[in-house]
Amino acid sequence: MKIRLWPLAPAAYCAVAWCFVVCPPALADEFEQHPPHEHGKVTLNAALDGNQLVIELDSPAVNVVGFEHEPRTDGERAAVSAAAKLLGNGRALFAMPSEARCQFEKAALKPPQWETTDDVPGQPEAPGQHADYEARFTYQCWSPDHLTWLEPALLDKLRNVTEARVNIATARGQRSEVATSGHVRVAMQ
C-alpha cells in the first residue's frame, strides 16, 4: 500500500512560505546579534553618518570590572560605580583628530544583567556565566572629512582589555580593524 502525500504538499509549501514571510519581521525586535563573548576583547562599531559619529561598545563585564557576577563586596560595588562613571565619559574613551572638530554629545550605558548564583565569594565564576557592558557614544563632527582616524583610549582604561575589534561604516564603505596596545590608531577612511 502506498501513501500519497502529494495532495498535502501545496498546503505545506504555503505554510512554510508563510513562516518565512511573516515570522522574521515579527521576531526581528526580539533578536539582537552580539559578537562572541571573549575575555580580553571588546567590539566597537563606529558609524559616521553625515556629521554624526556613533560608537557602540560591547565588552564582557570581566574586562570592565574584573568579574561577571552580581557585585557582592564593597570593592565590587565600587568597581561597578567607577565603570559607570568611566563609560559615561565619551570624551575620555576615544581620541580623534582635532581638525574633525568632533564634540561629544551623550553616552547611553546598558549595564550588565547580572546572573545571581549561590557562588561562594572568592571562588571562580561558574562556567557559562556571562555578563556584558554595552554603551553607545554619540558625537557631532563639524568637519567629518577630517575624521581620518580613531584611537580607542579604552585599551588603557578598561581592565584586562588586550584587543578591540573596530567595525567601521562610513559613506566610503565598511571594514574592520583590530586595535591593540601596540597599534591603537585605526583608520576611519
Where are each of the predicted segments found?
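Bacterial N-terminal signal peptides that target proteins for export
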Residues: 2-14
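Compositionally biased amphipathic helical and low-complexity segments enriched in hydrophobic
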Residues: 6-9, 28, 189
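Cleavable N-terminal signal peptides
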Residues: 14-15, 26
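Sec/Tat signal peptide C-region and signal peptidase I cleavage site
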Residues: 22-28
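N-terminal soluble domains immediately following signal/targeting peptides that reside
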Residues: 30-189
